[in-house]
Every structure is written in structure tokens, then in C-alpha cells.
A protein has these predicted regions:
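Alpha-helical transmembrane bundles and membrane-interface segments of multipass inner-membrane proteins
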Residues: 1-166
């Protein structure tokens, strides 16, 4: 298999693997901890703490009954758009852009599965900084944030590569 085909296959399989890791970690948390319980690992700095997020990032719209439907619709639309650009970036051999889009796609799909299946997103990764608790998140959130930062960096520092895809 030549390098381009190998990279294309890898970039297209990456979201599947990341979604699997996301869903398996959520399954572990749900079956290990009761809601709003967890376990600290590093001197009460890092812990797993099971929560159910009915909103979006940082629980935005969590208190709105219609919020889950709006978020699900927006997430589905964005996932489709990201996937279209992912396929296009692979076709033009822009693997750095494709990698960032794969991360974004995995993040969107991982949380979308939860929203459709459970009507909330399982969050569990928690960091405490003294009295401040950073908003609790999951593997899909990590993928989405890394993909977003990577895409912004590409657009700022390698604009010609991004232009080939858009």
C-alpha cells in the first residue's frame, strides 16, 4: 500500500477508534460509579467523577428542556459538514487538515451518540484547582477541542494547506 492510501485509511479509521475509546470509557464510568461520585487519583487534583450533562460545553443550555434537541440538531449538521471536508481533505492529500477534522468529527459523534441514546452526555474527567473545579468533560470533548485548536493553528500558520480543502 502506498503512503497516500495508507494515510487515507488511517485518517478515516481514526474517528472510529476515538469514538470507540470515548464510548468505552463512558461505559466504564457509568458501570463503576454512581451518579455524582468518583475517585481521586492525584491529590484531589485529577479525578473521575460521573456526571450527566444535558447541555453542551460547560453545561450551556442544560436548564432548557428544548436544549437537547437544538444541540442534537446543530451537532448533527456540524458533524456532516466536518465529514464532507474530511473526505475532501483526504482526496487532496492534506493529512494535517484531515487529522484535525478527524478529531473534530470523533468528538461530535462521540457526544452525539450519548445525546440520541441517553438524552444527556456522560462527563467524567475532572480537575480541581483548590476551590475551583474546571468543567467536567470526556474523551469526545478532548477530541473536539484538540481538533479545533489544530484547525485554528493550521489556518493561522499554514493557510495555503487549509485553502486547498475549502
Amino acid at each position: 500500500m502506498n503512503k497516500n492510501k495508507y494515510m487515507s485509511v488511517l485518517i478515516l479509521i481514526m474517528p472510529l477508534l476515538l469514538v470507540a475509546v470515548d464510548q468505552l470509557t463512558k461505559y466504564y464510568i457509568v458501570n463503576t460509579f454512581a451518579l455524582h461520585t468518583g475517585e481521586a487519583f492525584i491529590n484531589n487534583f485529577f479525578s473521575f467523577y460521573y456526571t450527566q450533562n444535558t447541555g453542551s460545553a460547560f453545561s450551556f443550555l442544560a436548564d432548557k428542556s428544548w436544549g437537547i434537541y437544538v444541540l442534537s440538531g446543530i451537532s448533527t449538521l456540524l458533524a456532516v459538514v466536518v465529514f464532507v471536508f474530511l473526505i475532501k481533505s483526504v482526496k487532496v492529500n492534506e493529512y494535517l487538515v484531515a487529522c484535525s477534522l478527524s478529531l473534530l468529527f470523533a468528538g461530535a459523534i462521540g457526544n452525539l451518540i450519548d445525546r440520541f441514546r441517553l438524552h444527556y452526555v456522560v462527563d467524567f474527567i475532572r480537575f480541581d484547582f483548590g476551590p475551583y473545579t474546571f468543567p467536567i468533560f470526556n474523551v469526545a470533548d478532548i477530541c473536539a477541542v484538540l481538533g479545533t485548536f489544530m484547525l485554528i493553528a493550521i489556518m493561522l500558520f499554514l493557510p495555503k494547506r487549509a485553502e486547498k480543502v475549502w
